[in-house]
């Protein structure tokens, strides 16, 4: 074994579907200042209020999608790890979670103890956001610094419109598209608008409701505009598959709280599409590379029920990339070149 590890990092999951484990997980997740970017006292108060009822509700949702092997997100990420090990000859391939287990600091410490000296850190997020990519990088840096770990790190950058990534999306989705459909909805995880606005250069006024978002903007803006990157992913995918305009659209899911989030909202689009006469709706969730509660339960279960109740006939959830062979090949190549 050589001394260069590949570390795949995903969001995380509760240890089980118990209310106590879900509460512990939600507390860690929501108290991250990159997730809820409010002063600590306000964040603590808000999260404490959320934790009164949300853990029980979320525990029920997790139970509805939990596998015999455990959390789908963790199981699928481990499958990806096993597949990636066949493509990474430089050292061990490990996984870590930003929240929950296996914890990122623990994995970094273990790698250092094993004699690893170089780490390619791969946040498994195609698009950039502080609440996903930045928090992973900062926790890794903090761990290395505080514990004086002898690790050199390089980081896989967001790959939202990398041609090979788009090809992997196409390869995984093609069997579902070939079965026929009325409309394709690409549903990305949403974010509060303020998360994006605070990253824009001072003096830049950017319309987060514009149809083309930051298309044509400077790299300084487009590199931090999550909404624009999602739209770029969707457009590149639709073009690669030859899907005509009007037969696909983009939306944003998982809104939490009363703040203004980026639009359009997935829950709104599901009703609109059903009422517009769409009978068979395909939904892809390209912000996620592994299926999780947001895809399996929020879209595959609740979203499907909502769409049918609004007049649609069938909602088909296209699986995430998971451990699809083309995705494994593409990810290995991107990590090699990181």
From Swiss-Prot:
Alphabetical keyword list: Cytoplasm, Heme biosynthesis, Iron, Lyase, Metal-binding, Porphyrin biosynthesis
Job description of the protein: Catalyzes the ferrous insertion into protoporphyrin IX.
Location in the cell: Cytoplasm
Taxonomic placement: Bacteria, Pseudomonadati, Pseudomonadota, Gammaproteobacteria, Pseudomonadales
InterPro entries for this protein: Ferrochelatase (IPR001015), Ferrochelatase_C (IPR033644), Ferrochelatase_N (IPR033659)
EC number: 4.98.1.1
NCBIfam families named in the record: hemH
One GO molecular-function entry: ferrochelatase activity
UniProt protein name: Ferrochelatase
Superkingdom in the source lineage: Bacteria
Enzyme class: lyase
Chief location category: cytoplasm
Pathway: Porphyrin-containing compound metabolism; protoheme biosynthesis; protoheme from protoporphyrin-IX: step 1/1
Stored CDD domains: Ferrochelatase_C, Ferrochelatase_N
Cellular component, GO annotation: cytoplasm
Catalytic reaction annotation: heme b + 2 H(+) = protoporphyrin IX + Fe(2+)
